Amino acid sequence: MKKLILLFAPLLINAQSWNLSGNSSTNESSNFIGTTDNQSLVFKTNNIEWLKIKPTGRFIYNNIDSAPGWDSNLLFGGGNDILTSKGNTAFGVGSFVNASTGGYNTAIGTNSLRGNISGFNNTGLGTNSLMNNIAGSQNTGIGANALGLAKGNLNTSIGSHALYGDSNGDNNTAIGGYSLRGVQANASNNTAIGAQSFLFLRTGTNNIAIGYNTASIELTNASNSIYIGANVQPTNSSPINELNIGNWIYGKNGTIGIGTSNVTCTNCTGYKLFVKDGIKTEKIKVEFANANGWADYVFEQDYKLLPLKDLKDFISVNKHLPEVPTAQNVVDNGLELKEFNALLLKKIEELTLHIIKLNENIEKQDKRINQLENIK
């Protein structure tokens, strides 16, 4: 009996082994690597635990359950063996493969964060997202090719090919497929919301585009411009301080046009609002800087009222009242509503003074006539 046990012992041992050179005639229900009790499967090298698969199916990588995991890297299909920093996560073939000193990056998708060497706190989610970023930090790219060629910092892109271009710019935000796709050089502080918005913005800073295909033409050196509405476009290829809302409200250097993109005119320095086809409103309030702008001074004792004879002579020669602009002048230059109302009031007050004086003369004449009639 003792000899029989010794004979079958090697067979029993071989039945429980998993050969390093490969196995055949396996059955997946009974041949596997793992545990049959409620314990974790642990992987070690040099007797140091690196990976643990919990009975619940969770992966615990080089970490104690109760401690945060920012001091480790988790790499599946990406990363490399020379990575010295911590807190990186890579899932995807070719993802994060050039990393060296960068830390706390997340790369999910084929070639995501592929070129990053020393950047920190980047997130790339999608094939080729943040693929060429080398040293940039705090970027977020979500979508295939999002931030694909960008190399700057603090950029956010959501959508296929959003912020894809070869740019070193910072602080850009692109939401929507192909938004800010063509940025180059140091384009910074731009915001594009809507598919294809700022599609071909090459260079420029502090610009905003909201809407589908908004400001999508070729733009260079654009700055401080805002475009809102689907298919709304700039008036030129290098706009500065420009506004276009729905092709109805336009702005240029702080001057606004409603219904017209022409916000300039002759002798219009200092004006800020231009409205085509008129304004209809129930209430307008015009403010005056001081009392001198109104015409009450006409009633002061020292006011020099133009005699009626002189007024008649002026009208005969000039065909208009003193101080009142000619018809041609109005055609050429328009009217200042506030000043013209004050001028009209002045003329009414002067007319009132003439009427009062004439009435006094009439009363004196009536009194004299009555006296003469009584003498008779």
Locate the predicted segments by residue:
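Bacterial Sec-dependent N-terminal signal peptides
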Residues: 1-18, 358, 365, 372
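Amphipathic, non-membrane alpha-helical segments that mediate helix-helix packing
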Residues: 341-345
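Short, basic/low-complexity N-terminal boundary segments at the transition from targeting/disordered tails
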Residues: 11-27, 220-228
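Glycine- and small/polar-enriched repetitive beta-structure motifs of secreted/surface proteins
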Residues: 32, 37-272, 276
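C-terminal intramolecular chaperone/autoprocessing and neck/assembly modules of extracellular spikes
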Residues: 17-25, 44-49, 55, 61-71, ...
